[in-house]
């Protein structure tokens, strides 16, 4: 019984990975093969689903980001303020998924960075985007 549940979980994970890979070309085209958070080019990029994830991968809720950004999102307590001051501009992106991730990162940084608190005080997000941003945290 346990083995069949583990097998089912693995199959579900593999199916999701394949579905994300299917978005790869469209993500690369949209991102112009650059990290959608920092604009960094010439580095390995990977798909990042902005939580909470939907039942099926959705390109509008998925970003193409660098390994450095992925690591920062996985371990937000290690964010270094000076390295992320670009968030002051990124949060104004026209893409909701970028706004959500930037907003969440700013809130993590605001616990110890004055500049992040100042940016948050100035940011205005569309109601729907703000609800998405507040629905989860890093």
Feature locations, PLM:
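OB-fold/S1-family RNA-binding modules
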Residues: 120-126
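N-terminal alpha-helical interaction blocks
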Residues: 2-6
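An accessory alpha-helical subdomain
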Residues: 112-119
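Polybasic, low-complexity binding patches
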Residues: 7, 73-112
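C-terminal, charged low-complexity interaction regions
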Residues: 129-138
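Histidine-centered nuclease catalytic patch
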Residues: 8-9, 13-20, 28, 37-64
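Zinc-coordinating Cys/His ligand positions in small cysteine/histidine-rich zinc-finger domains
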Residues: 65-69
């Amino acid at each position: 019984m346990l083995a069949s549940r583990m097998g089912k979980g693995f199959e579900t994970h593999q199916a999701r990975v394949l579905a994300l890979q299917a978005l790869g070309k469209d993500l690369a085209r949209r991102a112009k093969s650059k990290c959608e958070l920092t604009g960094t080019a010439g580095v390995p990029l990977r798909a990042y689903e902005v939580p909470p994830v939907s039942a099926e991968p959705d390109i509008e809720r998925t970003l193409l980001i660098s390994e450095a950004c992925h690591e920062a999102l996985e371990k937000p307590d290690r964010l270094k303020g000076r390295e992320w001051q670009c968030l002051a501009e990124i949060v104004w992106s026209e893409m909701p998924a970028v706004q959500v991730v930037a907003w969440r990162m700013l809130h993590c940084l605001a616990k110890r960075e004055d500049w992040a608190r100042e940016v948050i005080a100035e940011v205005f997000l569309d109601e729907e985007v703000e609800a998405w941003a507040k629905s989860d945290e890093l």
